[in-house]
Amino acid sequence: AWAELLAAEPNLTVITGARARDVRVSAGAGRPAVTGVSVEVAPGRSFEIESKVTIDCTGSGEVAVAAGCTALYGRDARSDFGEPSAPEQADDWVQAVTWMYFVQRLPGASPVTEGLPLGVSVKTGIPPRGHVGVWPSEEAQRHPDAGLYLHWGCAVPCRDTRNPVELARSHQLAYQAMERDHAVLHEHGYTVHLAPRIGVREANRIVGEYVITENDIRNSVFPPDTVAVADYGLDIWKPPAKKKHARGGHGEDGTVEVFGLETARYGIPYRALVPRDVDGLLVAGKCMSGTHIAQSSFRVQPIVAGAGQAAGVAAALAAKHQRRPRDLEAEEIRRLLSRPDQHLQLAFD
């Protein structure tokens, strides 16, 4: 299905395994403008891509930062955006990173009944870890040979998710924490399929023309330039409180902890995709403009996918009409987004 979608776009060229190496920026009449990127496809092999509009979907905002955009990182102070759950002082704390994996029981292998991860005994032979076990039905649970089973794996802190050395250190800690679990699984006939990379919840957040805040989410705000609908609660993983946290409880530093706090739908404004400092550039994904608390909600895949679709439409419009992305009207973008199955009408019910 994915290949068919790509084949239907004659002007689309997909380059896998590529990484942005450098950004081309020209001096504009007001702001500097991104005019292309240098992409590395193998060690020592790179090429230049010229562009009328570039979209940074790196997750960490690498292209935007290299282009000179202002970025936020870590927790914002309460006074920065008037968020009730923010700490009094800003710091560099970010959410934990997580390494997930699948397991599958090989035919004929004996069920795991002892020595399970976390000491859990599962007579069905399916070894869940924590709250991971997700099965389509009770029947599927009785026949573990039928499919793959997702495990949350391990969540570990990372001092700086922007630093590859620190990220590698967290990667190693996570693997060490799961090593015993994997040994038990292998012993009892399970294959283990680790995700190729550890999951990073939070890195740079690029300051845009609008900064999404906790108050927007709690109050279910739909700005007039909404281009995507978000429906996920505030969900900050493992805040730096010494005592066990509870939903809505208070941390050691005075913050109001918001782990899994459900909220109503809210809107992602187009201005949050438009960097404040640079032209010729849009951002989408978890690096779009928002606070640390707000990002704990909009970082999930369905929301960033919607924002990414809006950014793609906006980039096409800007290139076609030779306009800066910031000069587009949100109504133009919404009109095109209404053609595919994009549920923007929820914002205006």
PLM ranges: what are they?
Residues 2:
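Sequence context of c-type cytochrome heme-c attachment sites
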Residues 17, 21, 31-36, 40-53, ...:
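Flavin (FAD/FMN)-binding glycine-rich loop and adjacent Rossmann-like elements that form
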